[in-house]
């Protein structure tokens, strides 16, 4: 039992909806995705949780309160009893909506400052893993989204091109490169009309695998003219929103 409350507070923004973020505190596969293989959670009041770190250290606790998708509270202590005995500290996670997705607020209450100081870097690291685990799930289809963007860019048929853009982009999408400074879906669609008017037959194709980190995606591309000759190449940085849709594209020509 906690005899005094020394707090560690940390806040991060996750590019995902609260309901999705909350799954990483209630689903054992998602829980293990950011804590490590063998970690489990029974997300009901009185349910048990286990954290199994890669170095063999084990943490266990009991779920005290669950209010999906806004709040979960659980005890936190080490199986060895050191530096925190079982039941010796308490973690509260609060989730709120945010323009970018979800605001996560963590409060870890300890019995003394030494315990708190021991966990400052640990939570900084662990919540970084958490942010990546959530983003990897939300954006599991990022490569397909990127390919659909390049396909839309290359599509000479306005109806199908615009339908693709509606499906993969946000209404306020922004696009920047050496030939573009665009704001909003209508602006992007008009730009694509001009592309096909002045450069008929030009297409963009992805080259190699995408690289993804927390809703930011890098994709290399090549521009191929109607005659099959390469006309340029470069890299695009895509920023995805909380639903995995394209919110921003910045192109860098090689």
Language-model features and meaning:
Residues 6-14:
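Short amphipathic
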Residues 15-19, 139-171:
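Short acidic-aromatic low-complexity motifs
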Residues 15-33:
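Amphipathic alpha-helical segments
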Residues 18, 37-52, 59-61, 67, ...:
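A solvent-exposed, acidic/Ser-Thr-rich amphipathic alpha-helical stretch
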Residues 21-22, 31, 49, 63, ...:
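Hydrophobic pocket/interface hotspot
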Residues 53, 76, 106-108, 177, ...:
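Residue-level recognition of conserved beta-strand positions in structured domain cores
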Residues 70-77:
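Short, solvent-exposed secondary-structure boundary/capping segments
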Residues 81-133, 190, 194-254:
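A beta-strand edge to alpha-helix "cap/lid" segment located at domain peripheries
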């Amino acid at each position: 039992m906690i005899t005094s409350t020394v707090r560690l507070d940390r806040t991060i923004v996750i590019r995902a909806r609260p309901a999705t973020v909350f799954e990483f505190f209630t689903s054992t596969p998602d829980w293990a995705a950011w804590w490590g293989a063998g970690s489990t959670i029974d997300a009901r009041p009185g349910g048990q949780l286990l954290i199994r770190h890669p170095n063999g250290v084990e943490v266990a606790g009991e779920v005290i309160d669950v209010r999906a998708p806004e709040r979960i509270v659980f005890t936190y202590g080490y199986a060895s009893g050191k530096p925190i005995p079982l039941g010796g500290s308490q973690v509260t996670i609060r989730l709120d909506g945010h323009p970018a997705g979800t605001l996560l607020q963590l409060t870890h209450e300890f019995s003394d400052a030494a315990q708190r100081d021991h966990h400052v870097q640990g939570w900084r690291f662990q919540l970084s893993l958490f942010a990546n685990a959530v983003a990897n799930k939300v954006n599991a289809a990022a490569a397909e989204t990127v390919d659909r963007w390049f396909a839309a860019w290359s599509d000479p048929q306005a109806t199908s091109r615009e339908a693709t853009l509606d499906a993969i982009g946000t209404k306020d999408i922004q696009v920047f490169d050496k030939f573009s400074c665009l704001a909003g879906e209508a602006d992007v669609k008009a730009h694509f009309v001009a592309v096909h008017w002045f450069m008929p037959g030009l297409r963009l194709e992805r080259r190699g695998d995408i690289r993804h980190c927390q809703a930011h995606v890098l994709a290399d591309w090549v521009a191929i003219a109607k005659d099959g000759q390469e006309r340029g190449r470069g890299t695009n940085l895509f920023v995805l929103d909380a639903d995995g849709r394209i919110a921003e594209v910045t192109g860098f020509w090689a």
